[in-house]
Amino acid sequence: MLALGTSIPVIGEIEAPGLQGALRGTMILPAQSAPMILIIPGSGPTDRDGNNPQGVKAAPYRLLAEGLGEQGIGSVRIDKRGMFGSHAAVEDPNAVTVDDYVQDAGVWIDVIRSRTGAGCVWLLGHSEGGLVALAAAERLENVCGVILVATAGRPLGEVLREQLLANPQIAPLMDAANHAIDELSVGRQVDASKIPPELAPLFGQAVQEFLISTFALDPADLAKNTSKPVLIMQGERDLQVSVADAKRLHEAAPHATPAILPDTNHVLKTVASHDRNENIATYFADNLPLAPGVVDAISRFVKRH
């Protein structure tokens, strides 16, 4: 457990109580009175740094936390329940819903406030984590506001359908994919034995309850109902979430602050061309800085509120 003393800044491991074992993350506290941000990871096995076992090494959350710390803003970046440092929190990391992640966010808020004395905590969600942040802001107390980074403005079932349609290799499987998305979007599970093997990682029985919980939520509706300050940050070179998503969020929540970043992709790295391979290569590079403007936009927004 990270303990605060007189030595500032504080950087180290921090724990929160999970269902069966500890939830774990990394805290950066540049000063005792620093505003605090909880960084909520995106989809799948994404760790507290923003990396995953499939080879993603871009570490956007670690770089973001470090950059914010240099500007006097504290953070806690976390491993999701059942994964990585939080592996003991639950037995099955797939047996989860958005509500479960919201519950965990509430626990983290309590721990952060007790450790730092912060009156409230900002929720920063990246990609799917933005959906969790919006849902949490609607239900939890002591939330300063929401920072949406590369967050879809449509139900995630629609986003997934669009991503699959853009992949020519999936074309022969689109009837099955559309059926699965349609059924899950209305809360019905799909017979896993009838799902083509190529689609099993997406629609397998183990993840269907989670998909049902995410597909049921419209991020734009959640943003519309959020009275707290909202920052909508979107990169123009993002291959997974578009500027149109950011515009839909802003139309639903006109009180939000948009930040559209040129030449910035989904993992917050600089991509100067339309070349897809060049874009994806940044996901696997561990030596690239964040794109210009990412840290500054968040820092300005938090300090203004």
Could you describe each region identified by the protein language model?
Residues 4-32, 36:
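N-terminal cap/lid segment of alpha/beta-hydrolase-fold proteins
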Residues 32-68:
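Short, surface-exposed "cap/lid" segments of acyl-processing enzymes
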Residues 59-87:
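Conserved alpha/beta-hydrolase
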Residues 93-114:
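Alpha/beta-hydrolase active-site loop
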Residues 147-220:
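Accessory cap/linker subdomain of secreted extracellular hydrolases
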Residues 226, 232-234:
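Short beta-strand/loop motif that positions the catalytic acidic residue
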Residues 228, 241-252:
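Short alpha-helix in the alpha/beta-hydrolase fold that links the catalytic acid
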Residues 264-267, 273-305:
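Catalytic active-site module of serine/aspartate enzymes centered on a nucleophile-bearing elbow/loop
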